[in-house]
Amino acid sequence: MAWFQHVKLYIASCINLFTKIQKPYLSMAMDSKECSLLPFELFEEILCRVPTKSLLRLKLTCKRWLALFNDKRFIYKHLALVREHIIRTNQMVKIINPVVGACSSFSLPNKFQVKGEIYTMVPCDGLLLCIFETGSMAVWNPCLNQVRWIFLLNPSFRGCSCYGIGYDGLSRDSYKILRFVNGVFTKNEYANTGSYKPEVDIYELKSNSWKTFKVSLDWHVVLRCKGLSLKGNMYWIAKWNRKPDIFIQSFNFSTETFEPLCSLPVRYDVHNVVALSAFKGDNLSLLHQSKETSKIDVWVTNKVKNGVSILWTKLFSVTRPDLPVLLAFENLSYPVHFIDKNNRIVVCCEEVLADKRNVAVNIYVIGEDEIKSQDEIEQHQLGFSWPFISGYTYLPSLVPVPSSEDNTPE
């Protein structure tokens, strides 16, 4: 046991070294006597815990590291250990690590800037499905600076559509994109029957092909819910067309079918915050805040697997007089959250400043007994809020954009 603890401490010190060391000295560190004595397997255990940005500085130090960082097995091993960040895009891209208080900022890709505003994004494995207000669609890895434009069957922008990204099975060899019209905008179509038949578009990145089919849906995704990609499938908060029940709706990319999962553990109210996120990689989490009392409840599910019933468990509740109101006004962006390794809520939200003319974008770390920290990311004028969500939970990763040649759409 003492030997095991010694190895753990050594790995931790090496991670710290590779995270902080500057590029001109990386090759010297790799060739040092101490490093040369380490088994390559131990090096791999160290490197899969190093932040993505630091790994990219290591990438060109030698061919062996380049081969390792391009190895699919290592890429997903590293991804499984990456901590959640929050990404925001406006004129600039901001990637925030709230736990350590770090924020990196850089410009959007040049070709993004001529496509108009990003209407929405859906993260999956560090890849971002980007939907532009002009109708263009792209898959983007900000860390690797890779973009792939998606040729659209119908390039016209459809703000009433829902989007998703996932993959077929556990191999992750076949990422797919989903698009369908949300029934909340087509109530006249199901007024009599309770169901509607939208076109469902699926694009497979591997084969570079679209397919379209129609399916009868007796539910619709609630407004403000942009969807969550988890373990290859998509999840939304949805409502039955003819029943008051609110539930979790999923889309299975392997079977290419919609599957209802379970009811929400809270009463749904459009004036309250009800936000979906991931928990520990393969569980769902739900943040609920009552606008009337400001009380926050955090719920999590058991492991999400096909064919297994989903059970909700309350992780904790927070009732404090100094709790922030995560959505004080309807015209503010919707908050986004995740749960860190210490079971604290990390939430990004907008708050109106005392002058009533400006808005601060704040990140809170909230535990069961305290508000751990508050950091202001930026400010902007109060008014029409774009995008409609405060940010996105993001995992900086080495996952390459499939067939990542930059093929600009016509």
Swiss-Prot record:
Give the WD repeat ranges: 109-150, 269-309
Q: Which organism is it from?
A: Arabidopsis thaliana
PROSITE patterns recorded? FBOX
Recorded protein name is F-box/WD-40 repeat-containing protein 1
CDD domains for this protein: F-box_AtFBW1-like
Tell me which SUPFAM superfamilies the record gives.
Answer: F-box domain (SSF81383), Galactose oxidase, central domain (SSF50965)
Give one Pfam family, short name only: FBA_1
Show where the F-box domain sits. 32-79
Instruction: Name the InterPro entries for this protein.
Output: F-box-assoc_dom_typ1, F-box-assoc_interact_dom, F-box-like_dom_sf, F-box_dom, Gal_Oxase/kelch_b-propeller, SCF_F-box_component
Answer whether the UniProt record assigns the keyword Oxidoreductase to this protein: no
Q: Which UniProt keywords apply?
A: Repeat, WD repeat
